[in-house]
Amino acid sequence: MKLLLCLGLTLVCIHAEEATSKGQNLNVEKINGEWFSILLASDKREKIEEHGSMRVFVEHIHVLENSLAFKFHTVIDGECSEIFLVADKTEKAGEYSVMYDGFNTFTILKTDYDNYIMFHLINEKDGKTFQLMELYGRKADLNSDIKEKFVKLCEEHGIIKENIIDLTKTNRCLKARE
């Protein structure tokens, strides 16, 4: 009986393991679908503040053969506008690149597929770089444990807590979603 219990707990732990794009266990197909922007962080805060070029709100990720297609919304002159971007796989395992306000490379830091996904992005433009981190959820908000995990990851990447914006308290263009 103890052996069965141990086996069952082991299987549960394996199933609950988080995936990362740098790890062997990421199944990119599982990130396909609807997402909501929850938290946004950057070491260059003005990029993610209201009217910042990187203040975009995800609606959908579509997994293609060698790329990821994103549907975003952004607020321009008080109106919600759609943005479509396609990020291509790079030669580095688990890394994607896309042109948007400069050249961006990003990886998936963590995901459990069913609730959340965390991205880390490096933007290069005119010889300058900054980093951006994003937390998306399958629902319009996430529990505080996941948010705290994201804050800790941001701090590990040198992004201070004051540069993390809770987008659940802002206009995320939810009414513009189809």
UniProtKB/Swiss-Prot annotation:
Presence of keyword Secreted: yes
GO CC list: cytosol; extracellular space; nucleus
Disulfide-bonded cysteines: 80-173
Molecular function as annotated in GO: insulin receptor activity; pheromone binding; small molecule binding
Example of a GO biological process term: positive regulation of phosphatidylinositol 3-kinase/protein kinase B signal transduction
Keywords: Disulfide bond, Pheromone-binding, Secreted, Signal, Transport
Function, as annotated: Binds pheromones, likely to displace pheromones complexed to urinary MUPs and transport them to the vomeronasal organ (VNO) where they associate with their neuronal receptor(s). MUP4 is highly specific for the male mouse pheromone 2-sec-butyl-4,5-dihydrothiazole (SBT).
Protein's name according to its UniProt entry: Major urinary protein 4
Source species taxonomy: Eukaryota, Metazoa, Chordata, Craniata, Vertebrata
Gene transcribed to yield this protein: Mup4
